[in-house]
């Protein structure tokens, strides 16, 4: 269940308070204290809401309230507390005896704000306006995902010098085409008798791909790559 209203709104006065209502409220609180604001209007003979009586007393009728304009010292205290607490007017009012939170808020919006702006200070950040614009205009530039290419070409593979008969390898002392095919290597040969390897490796930051391509100088030399190795590279 929701909280019941503090009064019957159909039988309460609204609008500006009259001098008679102010005096009746002051006399009752002086004699009986504040007490319960929900029952105070009926006890004081006022056709007002309890909340209206409380705000009227706190913001206007309290005897310890300060009257008149804010002093320069109060301005400095408000500015300093606002830089630390922000728009927490109740906490700021607790450091300024005799001033209400509503009064300080209105004074901030109508006077201090304009005063700070005239001096080139941002009332929200309490910094110079040019400095605030510089900080807010800084943009973090992400690293571009441009591919970085590394190319290795014309790499010569020296002939084997050790004889090997394992796994059906040639025993002639040199690396044969069949050996390279079994090892899954991509190659081409030229007229000099050397077996050359050409690698064109492309790397990227977001995703990378590698490909090994053989380019021959003669019409007979053709690039070849093991299908298993090619399938593995395509998955990367």
Curated annotation (Swiss-Prot):
Keywords: DNA-binding, Nucleus, Repeat, Repressor, Transcription, Transcription regulation. Residues 159-181 are annotated as: Disordered. Residues 9-61, 62-116 form the HTH myb-type domain. GO terms for molecular function: DNA-binding transcription factor activity; transcription cis-regulatory region binding. InterPro entries: Homeodomain-like_sf, Myb_dom, Myb_TF_plants, SANT/Myb. Signal peptide: none annotated. Expressed in roots, stems, flower buds, and siliques. Induction: By ethylene, asbscisic acid (ABA), auxin (IAA), and Pseudomonas syringae pv. phaseolica. Residues 37-61, 89-112 bind DNA. It is found in: Nucleus. Pfam families: Myb_DNA-binding. It comes from the Eukaryota. Residues 162-175 have a biased composition (Polar residues). GO terms for cellular component: nucleus. The keyword Transferase does not apply. Interacts with BHLH012/MYC1 and BHLH042/TT8. This is Transcription repressor MYB6. It comes from Arabidopsis thaliana. The lineage of its organism: Eukaryota, Viridiplantae, Streptophyta, Embryophyta, Tracheophyta. The gene is MYB6.
């Amino acid at each position: 269940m929701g909280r019941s209203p503090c009064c019957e709104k159909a039988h309460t006065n609204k609008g500006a308070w009259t001098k008679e209502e102010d005096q009746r409220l002051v006399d009752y609180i002086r004699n009986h204290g504040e007490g319960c604001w929900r029952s105070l209007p009926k006890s004081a003979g006022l056709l007002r809401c309890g909340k209206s009586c409380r705000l009227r007393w706190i913001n206007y009728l309290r005897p310890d309230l300060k009257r008149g304009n804010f002093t320069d010292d109060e301005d400095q205290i408000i500015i300093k507390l606002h830089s630390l607490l922000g728009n927490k007017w109740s906490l700021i009012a607790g450091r300024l005896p005799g001033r209400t939170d509503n009064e300080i808020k209105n004074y901030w919006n109508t006077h201090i704000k304009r005063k700070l702006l005239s001096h080139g200070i941002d009332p929200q950040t309490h910094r110079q306006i040019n400095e605030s614009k510089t900080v807010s205009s800084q943009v973090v530039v992400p690293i571009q995902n441009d591919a970085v290419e590394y190319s290795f070409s014309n790499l010569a593979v020296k002939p084997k010098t050790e004889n090997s008969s394992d796994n059906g390898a040639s025993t002639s002392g040199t690396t044969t085409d069949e050996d390279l095919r079994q090892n899954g290597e991509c190659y081409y040969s030229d007229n000099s008798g050397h077996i050359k390897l050409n690698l064109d490796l492309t790397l990227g930051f977001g995703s990378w791909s590698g490909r090994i391509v053989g380019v021959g100088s003669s019409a007979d030399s053709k690039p070849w790559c093991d299908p298993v190795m090619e399938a593995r590279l395509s998955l990367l």
